[in-house]
Amino acid sequence: MNNLKKLGLTALAGSLVASTAFAGSLDVTGTAKVKYQSKGSERVTGNPWSDATTITFSGSGDLDNGMTINYGYTMANAVFSSSKLALDMGDTGVISFGNVSHQAGISKYSDMMPTAGEQVWDDVDATDEGVTDLGGDNTLGYEMTMSGITISASYARVGLGTDNSVVIIADELVDGASFGIGSGTNVISATSEDDMMTAWAKYSTGPITAGIQLSTIDKTAANSDVDREAASISFAVNEQLSVSYGISNVEYELSTKTDEESSGFSASYTMGSM
């Protein structure tokens, strides 16, 4: 009987020691936003006021080999939004896995236009048609930067096939400029998939940043392709105040759909924690 007790205590102690190797900090942050939105007289607006809140739990820990583990879990309006676990290997790159679309690949760079607020199509309550988003369920990502060139890729095995994408970004070809191009495949059904492509360019000088981005989604169904053209310019008035103007135009190949044009101004002011 005494031997059994000793064995049990030894096993418990061993498990406790092993768990401390992955201990790290856990931080909680949140945001709260109140928005007023007005639309043209030809559209039904309802209540123009709305609010949104987010809570994010983030943790990190260092491994014995110098690598770092990062974890994030986000709730939006009290509902699960995204989660991600990432292994930062330094110069070798970052491997990530989670239920979030913007961790790597074409979804992370679906809208690269500078803005003081949200994307112009989001601020005016337009659709995200033409935005190259693969979705984020159980996605494996990898991203590495070397000599000013960043390679970002994503892979997700779904029931009907494989969602995958790759993006290449160049930040040092021209001083102040950034260029990127990416492509991906989104499986829709056993006989249908979307081929996506996006390309963008941004240039910054002093407090001004301007950009343009072209995206296309080639659908399997005939006459169903979607093209998006976006451009914006932002100006940092000072450390607290920024303003921007952007446009987003969506063209549908299907004649029964009406092309969508969005434009808008955004402004943000930071004061302390607000």
Task: Name the predicted role of every residue range.
Residues 1-274:
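Outer-membrane beta-barrel proteins
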